[in-house]
Amino acid sequence: MTEQNPAAEEQQSAPRRTIKSFVMRAGRMTEGQQRGLEQGWPKYGLELADGLRDFDEVFGRSAPRTFEIGFGMGHSTLEMAAAAPEQDFIGVEVHKPGVGALLSGLVSQKLTNVRVYSCDALEVLRDCVADASLDRVLLFFPDPWHKSRHHKRRIVQPAFAELVRRKLKVGGVLHMATDWEPYAEHMLEVMNVAPGYRNLAQDGRCVPRPTERPVTKFERRGERLGHGVWDLKFQRID
């Protein structure tokens, strides 16, 4: 799945270029994706420029709320939202084909518990989501940036952990999954020392595969190649 950029530091002098943990790819949209964008965006789309939102007002109710960073083509988002109509989902993706695909699915399934941003997810977290308002934050199969010189691009960094912690309710959970073991180790290194979190794994490492996480193409691909998948859950405790 596509992932997003680390939280930008506050700028007090001349602007500095923010390191991005995603690359904007020029993907051509199918007719179905374009149709989904045109038909679905007016109902499901939200704009970063609108700033801080009251999501109870956006959804027309108060319900458990999940924020998904980088939903890719939206397959997992659709499956989770359809399986849990009593919950609300905010999905963010930078790549337009994926946004169009998810919107097409939302329109065809007539789901009402999903809203979509098409921009940098951590800018949405920072500017549009109230503190202590999310029950879950999902980060499934982010780009591992394999090369050492690119590790600074990995989304899971101390600043990311703190931003997510602020947006989670006390008791809320950050759920991450990766099919790249070195990235799982990196996630553990960052999160096990991040203030205000508790690792939900009994051994202080990874949790068994959660039943609520849909099987993704990344997971199926990894299984074919003999790779494992590592799930990590960290709960906000203060």
Curated annotation (Swiss-Prot):
Q: In which pathway does it act?
A: tRNA modification; N(7)-methylguanine-tRNA biosynthesis
What positions does the entry give for substrate binding?
A: K147, D179, T216, K217, F218, E219
| Active-site feature positions | D143
**Single GO molecular function:** tRNA (guanine(46)-N7)-methyltransferase activity
- The UniProt annotation places S-adenosyl-L-methionine binding at E68, E93, D120, D143
Q: Write the Enzyme Commission number(s) for this entry.
A: 2.1.1.33
Among CDD domains, the record links this protein to:
AdoMet_MTases
Reaction(s) catalysed by this chain, per the record, are: guanosine(46) in tRNA + S-adenosyl-L-methionine = N(7)-methylguanosine(46) in tRNA + S-adenosyl-L-homocysteine
Recite the UniProt keywords alphabetically.
Methyltransferase, S-adenosyl-L-methionine, Transferase, tRNA processing
One GO cellular component term of this record is:
tRNA methyltransferase complex
Question: Which InterPro entries does this UniProt record tie to the protein?
Answer: SAM-dependent_MTases_sf (IPR029063), tRNA_(Gua-N-7)_MeTrfase_Trmb (IPR003358), tRNA_methyltr_TrmB_bact (IPR055361)
The domain of life is: Bacteria
Q: List the disulfide bonds.
A: none
PROSITE patterns hit by this protein: SAM_MT_TRMB
Q: Could you tell me what this protein does? A: Catalyzes the formation of N(7)-methylguanine at position 46 (m7G46) in tRNA.
The record's HAMAP family line, in alphabetical order, gives: tRNA_methyltr_TrmB
* Family of this protein: Belongs to the class I-like SAM-binding methyltransferase superfamily. TrmB family.
Fetch the PANTHER family from UniProt: 3-DEOXY-D-MANNO-OCTULOSONIC-ACID TRANSFERASE/TRNA GUANINE-N 7 - -METHYLTRANSFERASE, PENTACOTRIPEPTIDE-REPEAT REGION OF PRORP DOMAIN-CONTAINING PROTEIN
Can you say what this protein is called? Answer: tRNA (guanine-N(7)-)-methyltransferase
Q: Give the source species.
A: Stutzerimonas stutzeri (strain A1501) (Pseudomonas stutzeri)
Gene this chain is encoded by: trmB
